[in-house]
From Swiss-Prot:
Glycosylated residue positions: 452
Protein name: Stromelysin-1
Main location per the UniProt record: secreted
Signal peptide bounds: 1-17
Annotated region (Disordered), positions in chain: 260-286
Free-text comment on this protein's domains from its UniProt entry: The conserved cysteine present in the cysteine-switch motif binds the catalytic zinc ion, thus inhibiting the enzyme. The dissociation of the cysteine from the zinc ion upon the activation-peptide release activates the enzyme.
Top-level lineage group: Eukaryota
Hemopexin repeat coordinates: 288-337, 338-384, 386-434, 435-478
Species per Swiss-Prot/TrEMBL record: Canis lupus familiaris
Cited function: Metalloproteinase with a rather broad substrate specificity that can degrade fibronectin, laminin, gelatins of type I, III, IV, and V; collagens III, IV, X, and IX, and cartilage proteoglycans. Activates different molecules including growth factors, plasminogen or other matrix metalloproteinases such as MMP9. Once released into the extracellular matrix (ECM), the inactive pro-enzyme is activated by the plasmin cascade signaling pathway. Also acts intracellularly.
The keyword Zinc is assigned to this record: yes
Gene3D superfamilies, A to Z: Collagenase (Catalytic Domain), Hemopexin-like domain
Length: 478
């Protein structure tokens, strides 16, 4: 036991030194993170590296201040806890330097119709979910510009989209899970215009992992010529912002201003624009209030990238172009339609909205009723016992329409124009958690939204489960 004092002395020295060593190691890691971040995103020269440990080094402090200002942090010139937390968040791999919302020289496409090709797929999602996320991401920019997009499955394309890990041949390697989510190149030939996504991330259609739609909409903004924005509410802000409710997604005014500085606004005379009154209906006695906590909807449909929520004689129109929904009379848009609709859905490939009331339905393109309508709902294949439709939703990936009646549903094949055999089925059987009658339904962002009274259920068709319970009027900013 004579060596015990020496052993205790040794342990005391080591143990007391350990926190100091750990603190020094943390400090070293923080400095390395800062150095790398400033080199990657703020053009800090690699020859400045010896100065990074000198806290008052002019080049480093100025770059830290530049970063803090751009990212909306308190400008201290010091690597404080907020700055460290921001640097550790997932983000885009495109640098932030510059006081502009477009790339230097404002590169842009010299045409308004662009092609895109999905070169490969992530194993994290079904192929149709990836296709849908990319299409929706491009539609975000299509809504506010004259740009149109078409997909090709072979040959060259203006924008090539791919998933890759680590070094993938563009001298801009990915870094594994977290940190850099993707990067893209400004308009031009060859690799320019292409968007790459780090396949070490866990890509999802919801917010349980990294949402592919949100990241793709950002990266494709780069493919169209946009640089990063210093506005934290902008889609083009470099750091990934998770939205608790994807239904509330909209472009910021900064995003709109940036893309329209390159391409202008959408053509006002486009046949693809809904013809809707420019002025909303003023609220008055007897008109439904958007933020009434008991508000329910008669029917809901999409229309050329917008959302229409029908109630009695009125409807709300929600667009990605504007934050606030408009409120209109149905008769001002569709003079021949009745009020108090039962169901509606858009068949996007035909540019037609089908609207149901009682035992009849109408096919509308723009404001025009199509020839031969209204028709009886039994021409679709419903039995005589079905007197009306409660709700309908079109799955544009499968080209199927789901019709809900009471606690059952039918499925209609839009390609074959016939009701599928084996129906009706119980709603709860194939839509677990959707146990009550469905008043209205539609599809958006890869989810089905089922409405009953003042509540709505967000349903993931891939996972076959309800992911959120929301108020029906959450789409109206309530």
């Amino acid at each position: 036991m004579q060596n015990l004092p020496a052993l205790l002395l040794f342990c005391g020295v080591v143990c007391s030194a350990y926190p100091v060593d750990r603190a020094a190691e943390d400090e070293n890691n923080n400095m390395e993170l800062t150095q790398q971040y400033l080199e990657n995103y703020y053009n800090l020269g690699k020859d400045v590296k010896p100065f990074v440990r000198r806290r008052n080094s002019g080049p480093v402090v100025e770059k830290i201040r530049e970063m803090q200002k751009f990212l909306g942090l308190e400008v201290t010139g010091k690597v404080d806890s907020d700055t460290l937390a921001m640097m550790r968040r997932p983000r885009c791999g495109v640098p932030d330097v510059g006081d502009f919302t477009t790339f230097p020289g404002m590169p842009k496409w010299r045409k308004t119709h662009l092609t895109y090709r999905i070169m490969n797929y992530t194993p994290d999602l079904p192929r149709d979910a990836v296709d849908s996320a990319i299409e929706k991401a491009l539609n975000v920019w299509k809504e506010v510009t004259p740009l149109t997009f078409s997909r090709t499955d072979e040959g060259e394309a203006d924008i090539k989209i791919s998933f890759a890990v680590r070094d993938h041949g563009d001298f801009n390697p990915f870094d594994g899970p977290g940190n850099v989510l993707g990067h893209a190149y400004p308009p031009g030939p060859g690799i320019y215009g292409d968007a790459h996504f780090d396949d070490d991330e866990q890509w999802t259609s919801d917010t349980s992992g990294t949402n592919l739609f949100l990241v793709a909409a950002h990266e494709l903004g780069h493919s169209l010529g946009l640089f990063h924005s210093a506005d934290p509410s902008a889609l083009m802000y470099p750091v990934y912002n998770v939205l608790a409710d994807l239904a509330r997604f909209h472009l910021s005014q900064d995003d709109v201003n940036g893309i329209q500085s390159l391409y202008g606004g959408p053509p006002s005379d486009s046949s693809n624009d809904p013809v809707v009154p420019t002025e909303s209906v003023p609220p008055g006695p007897g008109t439904p209030a958007a933020c009434d906590p008991t508000l329910s909807f008669d029917a809901i449909s999409t229309l050329r990238g917008e959302f229409l929520f029908f109630k009695d004689r009125h409807f709300w129109r929600k667009s990605l172009r504007t934050l606030e929904p408009g409120f209109y009379l149905i008769s001002s848009f569709w003079p021949s339609l009745p009020s108090g609709l039962d169901a509606a859905y858009e068949e996007t490939s035909k540019d037609i909205v089908f609207i149901f009331k009682g035992n009849q339905f109408w096919a509308m393109r723009g404001t025009e009723v199509q020839a031969g309508y209204p028709k009886g709902i039994h021409t679709l294949g419903f039995p005589p016992t079905v007197k009306k439709i409660d709700a309908a939703v079109f799955d544009k990936e499968k080209k199927k329409t789901y019709f809900f009646v009471g606690d059952k549903y039918w499925r209609f094949d839009e390609k074959r124009q016939s009701m599928e055999p084996g129906f009706p089925k119980q709603i709860a059987e194939d839509f677990p958690g959707v146990d009550s009658k469905v008043d209205a339904a539609f599809e958006a962002f890869g989810f089905y939204y089922f409405f009953n009274g003042s509540s709505q259920l967000e349903f993931d068709p891939n996972a076959k489960k309800v992911t959120h319970v929301l108020k029906s009027n959450s789409w109206l900013n309530c």
